[in-house]
Curated annotation (Swiss-Prot):
Keyword Transmembrane helix appears in the UniProt entry: no
Example of a GO MF term: flavin adenine dinucleotide binding
GO cellular component assignments: cytosol
Source organism per UniProt: Rhizobium etli (strain ATCC 51251 / DSM 11541 / JCM 21823 / NBRC 15573 / CFN 42)
The protein's name in its UniProt record: Methylenetetrahydrofolate--tRNA-(uracil-5-)-methyltransferase TrmFO
Keywords linked to the UniProt accession: Cytoplasm, FAD, Flavoprotein, Methyltransferase, NAD, NADP, Transferase, tRNA processing
Catalyses which reaction(s): uridine(54) in tRNA + (6R)-5,10-methylene-5,6,7,8-tetrahydrofolate + NADH + H(+) = 5-methyluridine(54) in tRNA + (6S)-5,6,7,8-tetrahydrofolate + NAD(+); uridine(54) in tRNA + (6R)-5,10-methylene-5,6,7,8-tetrahydrofolate + NADPH + H(+) = 5-methyluridine(54) in tRNA + (6S)-5,6,7,8-tetrahydrofolate + NADP(+)
């Protein structure tokens, strides 16, 4: 059945997870969409089919536990918002324990069929070689990590040479509450006070010589992940994996990212550390700290085991583990406004992995938000942002401004791709965590589990309220 709409179409460039979700959200709001996808005309080094929302790597959407896992929470919020990606994933799930894994072909076929069958969506198989022309007054770029070189060059020309990255160099991120401050201490090197700093901007983890040598041995022996053939990613100055630096000489690390100079152990000031691992605040909330200079190609299991050898990180919980990949993403915190619009080009939004989110559902969720925002703008409705207390809102807030931008490490950019995790959510109100009756000791893992359950419960309630409010605003417009 044909549906006639009086609205001009919104253009979406890229038919991956984010672009497909954005197109679906726009069409679901009654606005026509033209979805441009180059596969079918021009392939990529990683994709195998012409299907929309093809899963290039894993077939897992990770945990589906919405009671105490941040990924499960964003799954639930996307379902509430009518996500096509989640509906297709649910229909084509395969057994995977507590995770949501899918039959990749069935999933992609379902998304492709739904997009093609929607009367308000037109799919055009063509390569877009530049930024959208002026007559595309509203558009979304969702071209992902394998953005075509010509379009990437156009984005770079519009936003500036340093605004677009072609590789990510991800260092692990640790939850602040899991760091042992009886061993670690706050201090900037030489007590330097930088812009917005206090002279105590880093958390420092000391090592003696024996600990350092054991750590270097573990790094050299650790299992690593090789580059995929299509990545062709070279190592470059300023972003060597930590294990590669260790292989270049036993003293390399303690004269590089683990140098102890300018630091005094607050717990034992008369003893000079042989080496020091520094962690820097990563988000404005102060809940996440990244391991400075620790980008790595170690396998995830090896990372957790080896990095917990660091004094003070024995019980570390990781919000994100490290990696080094081919990727194309913009410096979103400086380029995008809170509605994902490019500040220099009103009407042009970015969505998905190109914004600096990491993961299938994260990419789709940013597409979901970009699509809803663009549809509201087309219809003349007020753009309603998801609350920061929701998974959608916390991820959006981090991408568009929650990350703390630093420039003290030449050759590196501080903004790196981020997955959804509880460290992005605002803290609970004081007094929210109450010890259960009859429990004598309530701390550590038990307290963390309750905290996450409360954050998840708050997120889902606030998301439901936001979606209800958004529907009301649309009805009034």
């Amino acid at each position: 059945m044909d549906i006639i709409s009086s609205y001009s179409p919104i253009h979406v460039v890229g038919g991956g997870l984010a672009g497909s979700e954005a197109a679906w959200q726009i069409a679901s709001a009654g606005v026509p969409v033209i979805l441009h996808e180059m596969r079918g005309v021009r392939g990529t080094d990683a994709h195998k089919t012409d299907g929309l929302a093809e899963l290039v790597c894993s077939n897992s959407f990770r945990s589906d536990d919405a009671t105490s896992n941040a990924v499960g929470v964003i799954h639930a919020e996307m379902r509430m918002a009518g996500s096509l990606i989640m509906a297709a994933a649910d229909r084509h799930q395969v057994p995977a324990g507590g995770a949501l894994a899918v039959d990749r072909d069935g999933f992609s076929d379902a998304v492709t069929r739904a997009i093609h069958d929607h009367p308000l969506i037109t799919v055009m198989r063509e390569e877009i070689t530049g930024l959208p022309p002026s007559d595309w007054d509203l558009a979304i770029v969702a071209t992902g990590p394998l953005t075509a070189p010509s379009l990437a060059a156009a984005i770079q020309a519009e936003t500036g040479e340093d605004s677009l990255a072609f590789f990510d160099a991800i260092a692990p991120i640790v939850y602040r509450e899991s760091i042992d401050m009886d061993i670690c201490w706050y201090q900037s090197r030489y007590d330097k006070v930088g812009p917005g700093g206090t002279g105590k901007d880093y958390i420092n983890c000391p090592m003696d010589e024996a600990q350092y040598n054991a750590f270097v041995n573990a790094l050299i022996a650790g299992d690593t992940v090789g580059f995929k053939e299509w990545e062709g990613t070279p190592y470059f100055d300023g972003c060597l994996p930590i294990e590669v630096m260790a292989e270049r000489g036993r003293e390399t690390l303690r004269h590089g990212p683990m140098k102890p100079m300018g630091l005094t152990n607050a717990h034992n000031p008369t003893v000079k550390a042989y080496a020091v691992v520094q962690l820097r605040q990563d988000n404005a909330l102060g809940t996440l700290y990244n391991m400075v200079g620790f980008q790595t190609k170690l396998k995830y299991g090896a990372q957790a085991e080896i990095f917990r050898m660091i004094p003070g990180l024995e019980n570390a919980e990781f919000a994100r583990l490290g990696g080094l990949h081919r990727n194309t993403y913009i410096n979103s915190p400086t380029l995008l406004d809170p509605s994902l619009t490019l500040k220099s080009r009103p009407g042009l939004r970015f969505a998905g992995q190109i914004t600096g989110c990491e993961g299938y559902v994260e990419s789709a969720s940013v597409g979901l938000m970009a699509g809803r925002f663009a549809a509201a703008e087309r219809k003349g409705e007020a753009i309603s942002l998801p609350p920061a207390t929701t998974a959608l809102g916390s991820l959006l807030g981090h991408i568009t401004g929650g990350h703390i931008v630093t420039d003290e490490e030449p050759g590196k950019r501080s903004f790196q791709p981020m997955n959804i995790n509880f460290g992005l959510f605002p803290e609970l109100e004081p007094g929210s965590i109450v010890k259960p009756e009859g429990v004598k000791r309530f701390r550590g893992k038990d307290k963390t589990i309750m905290k996450r359950q409360l954050i998840a419960r708050r997120a889902l309630a606030d998301c439901a309220a936001w979606l209800g409010q958004t529907r009301t605003l649309a009805e009034r417009a």
